[in-house]
Amino acid sequence: MPSKNSIQGSKTVDRVSIEAPGLSPQSNHNSSSDDEQDEQDDISQSDSDSDSDSDSLDSQASRKRRKTSQEPTQKDIPLIATTSVPSRVKAKSQKNSLDAKNVSNGATLAPTDAQTTFAALNVKPWLVGSLGSMAIKRPTGIQKGCIPEILKGRDCIGGSRTGSGKTVAFAVPILQKWAEDPFGIFALVLTPTRELALQIYEQFKAISSPQSLKAVLITGGSDMRPQATALAQRPHIVIATPGRLADHIRTSGEDTIGALRRVRMVVLDEADRLLASGSVGSMLPDVEECLSILPPPAKRQTLLFTATVTPEVRALKDMPRTPGKLPVFVCEVDTQALAIPPSLNQMHLQVPVTHREHYLHMFLLTEKNLPKSIVIFCNRTATADYLTHLLRLLDHRVTALHSKLPQRQRIDNLGRFRASAARILVATDVAARGLDIPEVGLVINYDIPRDPDDYIHRVGRTARAGRKGEAVSFVGQRDVQLIQAIENRVGRQMEAWAEDGVNLETRVIRESLKLVGEKKREAMLEIEEGREVGGKRKRGMKKLS
């Protein structure tokens, strides 16, 4: 008997590849414009997670049980090669380990050739020049594989690890086709988070600078009225999060959304997240709502890009195609054996769950880490908020990125980190996907993600575009199985963290026990009183009597 998730997965395929208007009933779905991934980053946690033991703040906070990815049954196991490797994290021996299996899925692997140019891919000179001005001289594997086929009019599924240039792989052919027939709305790009939507918008504007492209950003956290006006003016490209665009489709008139019925090209960026089904917080209903107003698949070109190719995504290539339409082109580059960049050094650091903050403080101050730009990932927004308060009180230059922050503050905080005004960014998984933050030298997993693919997205914030990077995971006594699952997924083991001349435990005992203990109490008091990072009371908050 097929599983519930596999049945839902087949419906997903129908929405994207066959007939968008034939949707399943969604009368009970009430999505606000903020129903995007960045509003759903409280990862599903079991009661045994070290996250629940880390600090008193988290143990008192409300717990949301949300999943970031589908948990497959045995029949639904993704066709992704896994390699069993010996873990160097101390643990009890386990009999059941994953066997290494190499699964051939017939995907097209674009060869790497340092001599290939964009001009050789039939990219127009104005685009070649624009890319050159952005220091993009030669195509990456995913770009070399996908751009020529998209220009031929083929639907495309592109899978490649983080930092491999997937945005350019779809932006360049879209802009070249648009320049030949510049009407609006020519293309729609759907992506899970506001920050990623903004980044894609900026890249479209930069690449199209020689032309008069009109692009519009449609995301939550902003007034809907100016967005509706912008849509009514028929821009050339719309970059949107599914929740907010679905709100416009439900509430706006035909004069606002009518131009979407003529869209020539649609992109699902981070398609694995957009098409994930069977979990609370799924974006699939909103994605279906957005697709329902577009031309049917036979009359549009559909492009799916992701760093993790899930069964829902891969199944699309096997759907019946319209007579006369070219078959779906599938290009997977570095999605299996090289899911983690070879220039990334993965390490683990075993810490007691009762003193993780103490170890984090001293770890950030070691001689090698002090000059680095650092992203710290937490599983929950409450933990991220708490660490931001604590690290500021400990005189670290820190800022935050999570779903509880207002949109304007999220943009400002990300800008501060990119401009090096803040050395440390404390974030939830809202920052794990797609964001290109230059020169991140170190990623810290303060909490271990339950899904190994989320780990891949997190550590992909460093070691981008061939640069070197480090990722250190703080491991508690209950995290060992999670680490082993990650090692099996990426096919590489984590080394124990070490730095010459540094005994972290000794430094914690000598220098941080009293100080961090005091600052922890101050941080929790600030949060209890509703104060922002920096001590200012939030608007609308009254002083506690």
Curated annotation (Swiss-Prot):
Q: Which InterPro entries match?
A: DEAD/DEAH_box_helicase_dom, DEAD_box_RNA_helicase, Helicase_ATP-bd, Helicase_C-like, P-loop_NTPase, RNA-helicase_DEAD-box_CS, RNA_helicase_DEAD_Q_motif
Q: Which family does it belong to?
A: Belongs to the DEAD box helicase family. DDX49/DBP8 subfamily.
Report which reactions are catalysed by this protein.
Answer: ATP + H2O = ADP + phosphate + H(+)
Q: Please identify the protein, giving its name as recorded.
A: ATP-dependent RNA helicase dbp8
Instruction: Give the organism, scientific name.
Output: Botryotinia fuckeliana (strain B05.10) (Noble rot fungus)
Q: Please indicate if the UniProt record lists RNA-binding as a keyword.
A: yes
In the record, biological process GO terms are: rRNA processing
The Helicase C-terminal domain covers: 359-510
Question: At which positions is ATP bound?
Answer: S160, R161, T162, G163, S164, G165, K166, T167
What does it do?
ATP-binding RNA helicase involved in 40S ribosomal subunit biogenesis and is required for the normal formation of 18S rRNAs through pre-rRNA processing at A0, A1 and A2 sites. Required for vegetative growth.
Show the CDD domains listed in the entry.
DEADc_DDX49, SF2_C_DEAD
Please give the record's comment on domains. Answer: The Q motif is unique to and characteristic of the DEAD box family of RNA helicases and controls ATP binding and hydrolysis.
* Annotated spans, Disordered: 1-98
- What are the entry keywords? ATP-binding, Helicase, Hydrolase, Nucleotide-binding, Nucleus, Ribosome biogenesis, RNA-binding, rRNA processing
* EC supergroup of this enzyme: hydrolase
- DEAD box (motif): residue ranges: 269-272
The highest taxon in the source lineage is: Eukaryota
Q: What's an example GO cellular component term for this entry?
A: cytosol
